């Protein structure tokens, strides 16, 4: 970078700057074939829960980094994007160094797709991979039949009255997870307000006798040709009954009914921790294959 460039923190992003950042993310996605940041970063653009680092060259936006603070045992996490026309100029390295100086050495720097430029930057900065998140996909055609589960009643999300049970199951099932664990009603409400939210694609499994929630599968539609297994959570007390597989297939059939009805092909994707070998094995049995890997880098040692 040169003396004409700047990398500065902003507490609040003006509306027009948020749009420029979205355009930057879109340009990088088109160039790389993979989005440089996750959906949560897009939700944070209008919030003050995270810190916003903006890189300018000659007054033009060329880079953006979002730094989420540590919380509930999770380290600080950063996601960044550099415009395709402004790479190999040290912008990414400068933003990462700035983020590490604020977040500390435990900060995780995410590289979505783990592309070669990201690996090279990480190596140059002395960062090593500490976490891998797999993206898996399969066609929505020719799905296996969802197996029955004795003593379970399946339903779809009825509204905020279901939130307390969803939170109980989610936070028990994902107590170990840096992003999915520790959810509050605000986390569900925020996603309920998203354009993609569809209560008919949010499946709940209740114990027929007690009425307690045993598990859930929240699906998401990205486009006319792509759906997602957004979250599958099973109460720790209900695991081992095949409920996760049944819920997954119920959601997959819902996505197939919705996306294949127009006669074109459609796929479904999901994200899973690379070291969650049981889940990866289950998804492989259901026909999913790894298509991409997101990697979190951190300071060595």
Swiss-Prot record:
A GO MF term: protein-N-terminal-alanine acetyltransferase activity
UniProt binding sites for acetyl-CoA 1: 80-82, 88-93
Keywords, ordered alphabetically: Acyltransferase, Repeat, Transferase
Biological process according to GO: mycothiol biosynthetic process
Ranges for domain N-acetyltransferase: 7-150, 152-301
TM regions (residue ranges): none
PANTHER family: L-AMINO ACID N-ACETYLTRANSFERASE, MYCOTHIOL ACETYLTRANSFERASE
InterPro entries for this protein: Acyl_CoA_acyltransferase (IPR016181), GNAT_dom (IPR000182), MshD_Acetyltransferase (IPR050276), Mycothiol_AcTrfase (IPR017813)
UniProt source species: Mycolicibacterium vanbaalenii (strain DSM 7251 / JCM 13017 / BCRC 16820 / KCTC 9966 / NRRL B-24157 / PYR-1)
Record's protein name: Mycothiol acetyltransferase
């Amino acid at each position: 970078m040169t003396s004409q460039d700047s990398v500065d923190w902003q507490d609040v992003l003006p509306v027009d700057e948020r749009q420029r950042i979205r355009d930057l993310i879109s340009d990088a996605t088109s160039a790389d074939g993979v989005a440089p940041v996750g959906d949560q970063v897009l939700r944070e653009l209008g919030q003050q829960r995270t810190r916003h680092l903006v890189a300018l060259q000659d007054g033009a936006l060329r880079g953006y980094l979002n730094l989420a603070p540590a919380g509930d045992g999770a380290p600080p996490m950063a996601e960044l994007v550099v415009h395709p026309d402004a790479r190999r100029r040290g912008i990414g390295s400068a933003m990462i160094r700035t983020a590490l100086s604020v977040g500390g050495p435990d900060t995780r720097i995410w590289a979505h797709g783990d592309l070669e430029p990201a690996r090279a930057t990480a190596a140059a900065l002395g960062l090593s991979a500490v976490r891998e998140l797999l993206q898996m996909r399969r066609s929505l055609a020719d799905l296996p039949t969802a197996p029955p589960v004795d003593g379970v009643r399946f339903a779809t999300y009825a509204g905020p009255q279901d939130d307390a049970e969803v939170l109980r199951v989610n936070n028990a099932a994902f107590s170990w997870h840096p992003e999915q664990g520790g959810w509050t009603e605000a986390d569900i409400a925020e996603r309920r307000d998203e354009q993609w939210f569809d209560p008919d694609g949010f499946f709940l499994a209740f114990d027929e006798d007690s009425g307690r929630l045993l598990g859930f599968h929240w699906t998401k539609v990205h486009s006319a040709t792509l759906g997602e297994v957004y979250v599958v959570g099973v109460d720790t007390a209900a695991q081992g009954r095949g409920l996760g597989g049944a819920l997954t297939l119920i959601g997959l059939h819902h996505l197939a009914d919705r996306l294949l009805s127009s006669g074109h092909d459609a796929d479904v994707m999901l994200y899973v921790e690379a070291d969650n070998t049981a889940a990866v094995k289950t998804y492989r049995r259901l026909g999913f294959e790894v298509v991409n890997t997101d990697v979190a880098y951190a300071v060595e040692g």
